[in-house]
């Protein structure tokens, strides 16, 4: 059992492993805002691949929550989920399932490496979306279910 002290997060304990974060049927066109592992997260299904992706919830540019918005043009124009990425509702930066920013509208040239969010390993099985509670350790190589 890991403690949050092991990760510099305080005194709470949490188990290491895979956890069901959503049933697969709930993951449709809109991203889901979740809180797991002491983090605000956003879960979405890529339109291109159909695969789920789980990212830290806040854009590194201005701190906007990637999943909580119903009024921005990105959401109204149905470009919130763009290909296999998700666009920030504020300035439309697009983050891929690996957490890297791969498009900044109006910017030509290289995208800074710091323009990224943490990506969490996910697996879809048994009608559920599973996420692993640690991102810095080696993942199991065998199927979980």
Residue ranges and their predicted role:
Residues 135-141:
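Conserved small/polar residues in nucleotide/adenosyl-binding loops
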Residues 22-134:
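Rieske [2Fe-2S] iron-sulfur-binding domain
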Residues 1-14:
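A boundary/linker detector
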Residues 15-16, 38:
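Short amphipathic alpha-helical segments, especially helix-boundary/capping motifs
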């Amino acid at each position: 059992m890991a403690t949050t002290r092991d990760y510099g997060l305080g005194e709470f304990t949490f188990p290491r492993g895979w956890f069901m974060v959503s049933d697969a049927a709930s993951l449709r066109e809109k991203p889901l805002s979740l809180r797991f592992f002491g983090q605000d997260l956003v879960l979405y299904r890529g339109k291109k691949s159909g695969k789920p992706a789980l990212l830290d919830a806040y854009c590194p540019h201005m701190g906007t929550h990637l999943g909580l918005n119903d009024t921005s043009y990105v959401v109204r124009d149905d470009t919130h989920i763009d290909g296999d990425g998700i666009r920030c509702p504020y300035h439309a930066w697009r983050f891929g399932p690996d957490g890297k920013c791969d498009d900044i509208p109006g910017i030509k040239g290289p995208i800074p490496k710091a323009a990224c969010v943490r990506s969490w390993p996910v697996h879809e099985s048994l009608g559920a979306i599973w996420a692993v509670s640690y991102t810095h350790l080696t993942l199991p190589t065998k199927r979980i279910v």
